[in-house]
Amino acid sequence: VETKADLVVVGAGPAGSAAAAWAARAGNDVLVIDSASFPRDKPCGDGLTPRAVAECERLGLGDWLDTRIRHRGLRMSGFGGEVEVGWPGPSFPSTGSAVARLELDDRIRKVAEDSGARMMLGTKAVAVHHDSSRRVVSLTLADGTEVGCRQLIVADGARSSLGRELGRRWHQETVYGVAARGYLATARADDPWLTSHLELRGPDGSKDKVLPGYGWIFPLGNGEVNIGVGALSTSKRPADLALRPLINYYTDLRRDEWGFDGPPRAVSSALLPMGGAVSGVAGPNWMLIGDAAACVNPLNGEGIDYGMETGRLAAELLDCRDLSRVWPALLQEHYGRGFSIARRLALLLTFQRFLPTTGPIAMRSPRLMTIAVRVMANLVTDDDADWVARAWRGAGRLSRLVDRRVPFS
């Protein structure tokens, strides 16, 4: 073994870097391994909900985030209406933000580095090695280097090749997301609202069909917006759409309104396991976090907040002797109810008539849309005592009782 550390973190995105920062601050010897060299891009909407802002502030990035754009809430359009809803929920900051992942991820990674974590970038972990008790004792990198570890956190993203090596399985009978995004210059890049178009239709022959997803325009405050389209899918009802023609069509629909010139640049797409739809998230001395553990909100595709949260929670468990049951149980405690009911609601959106029937009713009620924004962004905590929070938690408990497969199992 050429290199070793108390804790090896595979993946230097928001989840891995947050875990590394918290673990290093607690006095652990931490090594972060990532196949990419930073800064690097990542397909994402770049939006930060108040939940994500809270986690950035907890990590010490509040002052840095104050130098970036702040958003008041969501502007939602579709079905003949438009409504602006300020970020609701008493337990989180009153503003969100949006920062390109090229910049955000490297900034969070530097927090981990400044906290004492070592970095091995531009090299991929390709294999894990166990002892007789199934504890991971070392990893092999693509260049043949052996890295020894006492504990391992896997944060290598939605496809999680190392997670598959450890036995992770993705269950596609619940909803997952497909999305594409790009960037466009506009004079409206400082607009203080994240814009979502809920009546998403495709080009050509599919114009008469509302797709199970939404289009978005997220101002970045730097002269550009992140523009994208996303749709929900299941193994039984796959989203039958070509993302690049769809994002180009969506851009053309919004061109005059936003003053866009030309096609989006840097278009890239992603596949998103959601709502804890994976099993095999832990072993005796290892844990999957963030996108690798399908910690993505099924109702809005948001994953940065859950990534940073699970990184912090994982770092708090490093003294645990056996994580095999402790980590899945903790994930279920924190996210099980919310993910279960969100998966169920998102599944309804994949039925062709659901959105055209309910969308016009919801858009006519600002109060209903305020509730929708709050639960869609999961701006509900166990400490919130209002009726919306109680109803959401109760619905989550009922939903879990009838789940064929509960989240993270």
PLM feature segments, named:
Residues 316-409:
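C-terminal helical "tail/cap" subdomain of flavin- and related membrane-associated enzymes
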Residues 111-260:
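Predominantly flavin-linked oxidoreductase catalytic cores and closely associated redox partners
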Residues 8, 24-44:
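Glycine-rich FAD pyrophosphate-binding loop
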Residues 53, 57-107:
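A conserved beta-strand/loop capping segment in the N-terminal third of enzymes
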Residues 1-15:
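Beta1/beta-strand and adjacent pyrophosphate-binding region of the FAD-binding site
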